[in-house]
Amino acid sequence: MSIRTPMKLGIPKGSLEEATINLLARSGWKIRKHHRNYFPEINDPELTARLCRVQEIPRYIEDGILDVGLTGKDWLLETGSDVVVVSDLVYSKVSNRPARWVLAVAGDSPYTRPEDLAGKRIATELLGVTKRYFADAGIEVNVQYSWGATEAKVVEGLADAIVEVTETGTTIKAHGLRIISEVLLTNTVLIANRAAWEDPCRRRKIEQIDLLLQGALRADSLVGLKMNVPTRCLDAVLDQLPSLNSPTVAGLRDNTWFAVEIVVDNGVVRDLIPRLREAGAEGIIEYALNKVI
């Protein structure tokens, strides 16, 4: 059965926007944005797309304004929205690693532990999570909402510490701050409205989206290798091969040669290709992968 009314897909606007649109493209969904328009085109008649603030997507999905969308685990915890968490999708603005919400203080401050901040002012956008973090630790602090430029609050004397999100810590250090604790590890999550999830047709579509997004993410860290190998060198070449599964080995028309194909981790290729060449492989081709399911 097909979906009669297109499902509404929430795409995070802002720091995750470009990475999410690229991921959707690799998964098979091309997004075409229009200037000053929050309703981009998508090449799927069963979907309509909406650009929304990542902080608002959980609420929109809970309320049925959106059927499915991508948001941060941090904002899901912050809002406490009642939604179905379909899967974790570990990617962020610049990498395929989780991001961290960290507690940071001035580099020259005397504070070295969260306990040292008792009675102090903490600035953050992640208000609820930060309050729970200190409450769980039994530390009384004054948590204040930050409307932006959070890293500057300590420098300007507006706060004694901040809780801010970071991928690498570079921006934190650039503002003369020092991380003293990790508050939360976060990543992107695919979430769905509960009514949409209970509908068989819509659930099938959500599961399709999840499958292809996961496949595209998995492919990011993998590459394919093809090569021709003389029969006399086949065992030596196969001994060099790590693989996602067993390599594909096929005889060629010239029965003194084999074609070998594998999928390997991108990080091993620079060392692997020279070893394969030394073992007797020829015509080695490396190619990118769009999805690995």
From Swiss-Prot:
One biological process term in Gene Ontology: L-histidine biosynthetic process
Record-linked Gene3D superfamilies: 3.30.70.120, Periplasmic binding protein-like II (3.40.190.10)
Main location: cytoplasm
Domain of life of the native organism: Bacteria
Matches recorded under Pfam families: HisG, HisG_C
A single Gene Ontology CC term: cytoplasm
Listed SUPFAM superfamilies: GlnB-like, Periplasmic binding protein-like II
Regulation: Feedback inhibited by histidine.
InterPro entries given in the database record: ATP-PRT_HisG_long, ATP_PRibTrfase_cat, ATP_PRibTrfase_CS, ATP_PRibTrfase_HisG, HisG_C, N-reg_PII-like_a/b, N-reg_PII/ATP_PRibTrfase_C
The enzyme's E.C. designation: 2.4.2.17
Cellular location(s): Cytoplasm
Reactions catalysed according to its record: 1-(5-phospho-beta-D-ribosyl)-ATP + diphosphate = 5-phospho-alpha-D-ribose 1-diphosphate + ATP
A GO MF label: magnesium ion binding
Free-text function comment from the UniProt entry: Catalyzes the condensation of ATP and 5-phosphoribose 1-diphosphate to form N'-(5'-phosphoribosyl)-ATP (PR-ATP). Has a crucial role in the pathway because the rate of histidine biosynthesis seems to be controlled primarily by regulation of HisG enzymatic activity.
Family: Belongs to the ATP phosphoribosyltransferase family. Long subfamily.
Name of the protein in question: ATP phosphoribosyltransferase
Native organism taxonomy: Bacteria, Pseudomonadati, Thermodesulfobacteriota, Desulfovibrionia, Desulfovibrionales
